[in-house]
Amino acid sequence: MKSSKKLSCILIIDDDPASNFFHQNIIEELDSKVNIQICQDAEHALEYLVKKSMFSEFRPMPAPDLILLDIYMPGMSGWDFIEEYNKIRSQLQKEATIAMISSSSDPKDLLMAEENTFVQKYIPKAVDGIHLKSWINENYVQQ
């Protein structure tokens, strides 16, 4: 059953520019009106989220409905991001759904994602993006 949640902004957090480009194209195919923000590391993503809330009255910075989060990045990992995100949630205008998106085939990563209360979905990176497409279609109404 399709959800009635609207998807107006997605924040992609991934250190790989090719993956970001690929995921951006997949999302735009599904919904050309969705605002896509990209951060190539978790530190900048946290800064974006906090500043978005701090300056929302002065500057239109869209708050994400969905965060697509890579697990393995230099510096702060996706798991570290989730820990820090939990600390700043009260400062945010709205909470985003977090989906881990990774090429990791380590079963521990899948298990950690399933056990983490902040991660709604673990989406394997695929050459055709089929997992991401179907999950977005199942969970969000396109505008």
Residue ranges with predicted function:
Residues 25, 80, 94-99, 104-121, ...:
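Alpha4 helix (beta4-alpha4-beta5 surface) of REC/receiver domains from two-component response regulators
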Residues 1-11, 17-32, 60-63, 124-143:
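Non-catalytic signal-transmission and effector/linker regions of two-component phosphorelay proteins
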Residues 67, 121-122:
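Two-component signal transduction core modules
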Residues 79-92:
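Short amphipathic alpha-helix used as the core "switch/output" element in two-component signaling
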Residues 53-68:
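Active-site beta3 strand of CheY-like receiver
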Residues 38-51, 78:
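Helix N-cap/capping motif at the beta->alpha junctions
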Residues 73:
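Receiver (REC) domain active-site loop signature in two-component systems and cognate sites
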